[in-house]
Regions:
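Helix-coil boundary/capping segments in enzymes
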Residues: 1-377
Length: 377
């Protein structure tokens, strides 16, 4: 499928969309070295060799921004690689396998190699890498198939540079959100307000995702202690997202930026109910501490935040799943994601099996369609 697909689209086809995948990870053929040609001559000279520029080997190991916790069985699905290429590096193969094969009508791309970009100590280097990635993604993926959509990457270390990148990229065809790699500063802090203002101004949601750098680097996002094993880290990812969600709500970010939207990708979902209940209960007795939070915290959560399904919860008793969906208001806040090409990929044909058909449709299509608006068409 090529860009000719876009010309062939009709209103009838757009109305028949069935599945929107909110978390797909494209990877670069030679790791970060792939981005060197997308940088200015000065930046190529300054950091090109450090990114592996000029080498043929994948260079993510020269600058370890992710995968610090190693899955001994492999982090990728073995079948997601075309012969001679690494997983999810070929947009044609990915389109055939994921979009055609799984019946996915829109796939939102979140930068695979840059999940840990927010932990980098040099803001200018991080911003340069983000900008180069955005140009590469548009050229390599978004122009290839009309079904791909992209999250433009920003480096959160320097809000001014991040805003410049948002302004530069916001009108590019296929861009539907801003992918903000997590940083050491919780998301409710004033540090991010210029970014939120730009996101609201352009009508672009902010999306965050686990980084793989948690607690390892000085500027990485924080868990309650540093896990030793991959299985620990993977099971505890919700800690990061609980902390950031509470920060957004308690700092009154959605009062200050009422049109701002935030997506928590791959952060778990069962904790949503408990956190919302606790914040609502405490808000009644502690409102004097946060007078800018004028409504129940859960009201802002339900209106301004969305959460992706993968890795989907698997309770021992299947009937508990329906109860959980009701507790977290899944018919409004939950959006389907596959996490392709990772090892724990959720297949849309069975990931939500057992849920009522109407709820499945809400999660797989209606919720993301309403959330992203016309940009997803």
């Amino acid at each position: 499928m090529t860009t000719a697909y876009a010309a062939a689209q009709t209103t009838e086809k757009k109305q028949s969309l069935a599945i929107i995948d909110s978390d797909v990870h494209p990877y670069m053929e030679n790791g970060l070295a792939t981005l060197v040609p997308y940088m200015s001559t000065a930046w190529q000279k300054r950091i090109g060799s450090g990114l592996g520029g000029g080498h043929t080997v994948a260079s993510q190991f020269h600058l370890p921004l992710d995968y610090l916790y190693i899955n001994s069985s492999g982090g990728m699905r073995a079948d997601t690689a075309r012969p001679g290429m690494s997983p999810a590096t070929d947009p044609a193969f990915t389109a055939a396998q994921l979009l055609d094969g799984a019946g996915i009508d829109r796939a939102i791309l979140l930068a695979g190699h840059l999940l840990g970009l927010g932990a980098m100590p040099d803001p200018q280097v991080a911003a340069t890498i983000a900008s180069a990635y955005n140009d590469w993604m548009c050229e390599r993926w978004l122009q290839f198939d009309q079904r791909y959509r992209g999250g433009l990457v920003i480096a959160p270390q320097d809000p001014e540079l991040a805003v410049k990148e948002i302004d530069r990229m916001s009108d590019r065809p296929g861009i539907v959100e801003i992918f903000m790699p997590l940083h050491e500063i919780l998301m409710g802090e004033k540090h991010y307000y210029p970014i939120y203002e730009a996101a609201q101004r352009h009508g672009l949601p902010i999306c965050v995702h686990p980084s793989g750098t948690e607690n390892v680097y000085a500027r990485a996002p924080r868990m309650a202690g540093t896990p030793t094993y991959y299985i620990e880290w993977h099971a505890l990812l919700g800690q990061i997202h609980q902390a950031n969600t509470a920060s957004l709500l308690c700092h009154g970010v959605f009062e200050r930026f009422p049109e701002l939207k935030v997506v928590i990708a791959e952060g778990g979902i069962a904790w949503i109910a408990e956190l919302a209940w606790k914040l609502d209960a405490d808000w009644h007795g502690l409102r004097d501490e946060i007078p800018w939070v004028k409504r129940h915290p859960s009201d802002y959560l339900n209106e301004n935040m969305r959460f992706t399904t993968q890795p989907f919860v698997e309770p021992p008793k299947r009937e508990h799943l329906t109860s959980l969906m009701d507790m977290i208001n899944a018919e409004k806040v939950l959006m389907f994601s596959s996490d392709y090409p990772h090892w724990n990929y959720n297949d849309p044909t069975n990931a939500l099996a057992g849920l009522p058909e109407e709820l499945q449709r809400r999660i797989m299509f209606d919720n993301p369609r309403e959330f992203y608006g016309d940009r997803i068409n």
